[in-house]
Amino acid sequence: IPNLIEAGIVSFKIEGRLKDMVYVKNNVSFLRKKIDAYLEQNPNYTKASSGKCTFTFDSELNRTFNRGYTDYFVNERHQAIGSWESPKSKGQYIGKLIKTIGNSYEIENGELLNNGDGLCFINENNEADGIYVNKAENGIIYPNVLKEIKDGTFIYRNNDAAFIKIVEREDSAVRKISTTLVLTENENGFELTATDEDGY
């Protein structure tokens, strides 16, 4: 972000087409915090927008839809620049599948998972596959559908139920513009004048 600002970029576009509110809030807040942190250290730059944004959650790009990252050809040319496993979002890496136990799975760091989470993994056909967590208990995951997953398979969370619940709150992202109110008395009664922080 600092390099882009110093290169003269004045507007940052977020890829939000067909995305939901949680995705937009998460991505906007992530960039807003990065930009604000830079502006605090560099008084020669100022933001174009008015007001101050506050967020009640810690934004993390891999907790909402994310296809991963590439530096394209910035550092060197690569033979393959695409993600060929799937156009879907794998999500946040949780850990490896330790073993299948009856109708459940034991997963590394399984205690991080919650009821309603969506999990993604790459199956033996090298395709993205997934399950939902019906119940998470003491690191053991009971899925909505029991699928054959090889021990050692990397497990990702691409639907974070607890995070979504926090971000969906109406007060999770708020922008306020400071205003000065002046109440004066005139021959016709009283007049209230409001002036925002930019003098309008």
PLM region descriptions:
Residues 1-200:
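Surface-exposed amphipathic alpha-helical tracts and adjacent flexible/coil segments at the periphery
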